[in-house]
Amino acid sequence: MLAKLDRLLSQANIPLTDQQKQQLVDFVKLLDKWNKAYNLTSVRNPDEMLVKHIMDSLVVSQHLQGQQFIDVGTGPGLPGIPLAIANPDKQFVLLDSLGKRITFIKNAIRELKLTNVTPVLSRVEEYQEQQFDGVLSRAFASLNDMVDWCYHLPNTSGHFYALKGQYQPEELAEVSKPIELVDVIKLNVPELVGERHLVVLNR
């Protein structure tokens, strides 16, 4: 699995240390192991997880601005844990409302010895602890839902980072709260079938 990850990282031009690569492989192994009992992801094959979960998360890394991030609806820690491994200098809060996901994330943090991840069991609208440089999510079906539920989370210069498949410009027109489009970035995820985009917004 390490050899495949090496190849994917090379294709995506993402430089990581040997320790970071090993942490990512160990995370996939943990996810695969826990998935059998907890049903954390519909992706069952570890090699597929490397592409659909690890690489799909890591390609966002170079576009992040700031130090404090929250991953809303993180599920089993995606994209938060891969991004935290790749960015040990940044802090990540991983938020989810389902206990089994947060239990898995706590275990992964312990096993991988991550010091820059804080798991939080909460609904997003009830989380008022702090504001962030970036609000990340792969979980929302529409931009309007993401902005609506997470509007209180970015700080004054913070951004929303929405990981999407295809980007439909009309989605932006459906956002009910005041928002500004900063960028739409086409992401290159090696071996992934289908388009991926990062939509960057600010208030």
UniProtKB/Swiss-Prot annotation:
Keywords: Cytoplasm, Methyltransferase, rRNA processing, S-adenosyl-L-methionine, Transferase. S-adenosyl-L-methionine binds at residues 73, 78, 124-125, 138. It is found in: Cytoplasm. InterPro entries: rRNA_ssu_MeTfrase_G, SAM-dependent_MTases_sf. It catalyses: guanosine(527) in 16S rRNA + S-adenosyl-L-methionine = N(7)-methylguanosine(527) in 16S rRNA + S-adenosyl-L-homocysteine. GO terms for molecular function: rRNA (guanine-N7-)-methyltransferase activity. CDD domains: AdoMet_MTases (cd02440). Pfam families: GidB. Its main location: cytoplasm. GO terms for cellular component: cytosol. Its EC number is 2.1.1.170. Belongs to the methyltransferase superfamily. RNA methyltransferase RsmG family. NCBIfam families: rsmG_gidB. Specifically methylates the N7 position of guanine in position 527 of 16S rRNA. This is Ribosomal RNA small subunit methyltransferase G. It comes from Glaesserella parasuis serovar 5 (strain SH0165) (Haemophilus parasuis). The gene is rsmG.
